[in-house]
From Swiss-Prot:
Binding site for (E)-cinnamate: 114, 202, 208, 238, 311, 339, 342
Origin superkingdom: Eukaryota
Keyword tags: Cytoplasm, Lyase, Phenylalanine catabolism, Phenylpropanoid metabolism
GO cellular component terms given for this protein: cytoplasm
Biochemical pathway: Phenylpropanoid metabolism; trans-cinnamate biosynthesis; trans-cinnamate from L-phenylalanine: step 1/1
Role noted for this protein: This is a key enzyme of plant metabolism catalyzing the first reaction in the biosynthesis from L-phenylalanine of a wide variety of natural products based on the phenylpropane skeleton.
Protein name: Phenylalanine ammonia-lyase G4
Subunit structure as annotated in this protein's UniProt entry: Homotetramer.
Catalytic activity: L-phenylalanine = (E)-cinnamate + NH4(+)
Keyword Cytoplasm among UniProt keywords: yes
Gene: PALG4
EC number: 4.3.1.24
Annotated PROSITE patterns: PAL_HISTIDASE
Amino acid sequence: STHTLPHSASRAAMLVRINTLLQGYSGIRFEILEAITKLLNHNITPCLPLRGTITASGDLVPLSYIAGLLTGRPNSKAVGPNGETMAAAEAFTLAGINGGFFELQPKEGLALVNGTAVGSGLASMVLFETNVLAILSEVLSAIFAEVMQGKPEFTDHLTHKLKHHPGQIEAAAVMEHILDGSSYVKAAQKLHEIDPLQKPKQDRYALRTSPQWLGPLIEVIRTSTKMIEREINSVNDNPLIDVSRNKALHGGNFPGSPIGVSMDNTLVLAIASIGKLMFAQFSELVNDYYNNGLPSNLTGGRNPSLDYGFKGAEIAMASYCSELQFLANPVTNHVQSAEQHNQDVNSLGLISARKTAEAVEILNVMSTTWLVALCQAIDLRHIEENLKNTVKNTVSQVAKRVLTMGFNGELHPSRFCEKDLLKVVDREYVFTYIDDPCSATYPLMQKLRQVLVDHALMNGEKEQNSSTSIFQKIGAFEEELKILLPKEVESARLELENGNPAIPNRITDRRSYPLYKFVREELGTVLLTGEKVGSPGEEFDKVFTAICAGKLIDPCWSVLKEWNGAPLPLC
């Protein structure tokens, strides 16, 4: 039922409550704890309501449903190991609980219901996922820097050491480790040397300041994690029974304030801000004005007019981010006085945990879309490198064939054009022309022609002689290129599609490779081209299912397995 607490959260509450009661300050029989344990071990879960608690005198309402099952109330329901619904008697039989239902003794009812276990149980699950997503966001930011051909100095330890914040230092060190020795970074440095003005001197904020953005969020998540860790190991019912002094202490450990505060901080500050960064990075990656040569919308097909790539995904990301920002409002400032003003202040801890769980789900969807987009960008860089190599070889071949010799076999002045022609290929972004490489309206042919015209203008009096004129070679050069280049480009594409590229994918020797390998090989996702029946949503679904099942943890950790936890030494 949509009005029932998820069974995983109910089971977490049972475990946390057992942990609290085992500490011996709650006045409850050990046999009751054994019964709850048997229910857990036999995968029998009481049905708890989704709503109805303010986590003030603990989570009274949902915890009473566990007590109701233990005492055999006729309306008590549980869910069995195969999802079947059962009454209390069947649950006891299946769990092997002997002796019948419990008749509660003094204090035992309060011991069961007067505590924060439901809120803190759900909060602990939420924070586990949030910690994983925080590390994933660091890793994905580093991969983003690679595919964007970013400048790696943004991770230099001195910059972050001077800022003093530990979360920022950690985020930068993680990214620095992934980028250290990256062939993508080395290739980007060569491009910057070829044409220093081709891209901005400094990368945009979503890349360059990602450690500064993520750093405080990591610290917030760590603080919240520590608060919930303390809460799930605390004694939080009332009154407390101090056997050593023969006292019943009437206090107030039952409010879930640590839950509400930690969940609000995690939701409002951390999760929403991580999502905002992912959206900013995603928007930059799909925009060909910013992404340093990748195709608009990361289209991978031969015909960009028929392949909209990640355009729909970008719209979806805007939707996810908007919903996430809406959820990023604190819950604890909406407290209402309750129980005839006895519970006049309360925590709303479980409500905050539920809303944070919703936010985590949205961030999972955003992480899915972002990860698939990065894998697409990695493959497009591989395609770009192979196609540029093909174009360069073809231009060189045609230049040698057409421009080297004159009509009578003599060396021709146009032979000196080849070097400048190849510089054009090096500087021009492949995806600005590759769908129709010989089109006169695309930049490649225009700039190749301009090189020949410039050389012709410098040829002086030799231009007046048809046997030494460079200008008269332009037509032959272009015609030869139009015959050869489209065939060579298509041949290179087919080799890529058949897994036999001339240049292997650089990602295979990178530290980020385990994540790429998991998405591409283990989950079986493919490059999106618009040429196949499968839709982007099918690829996203594979990754989202894996993230929700916790399968992304191992490959994410594998990316960092060689990291010693410290920044690279300054040198």
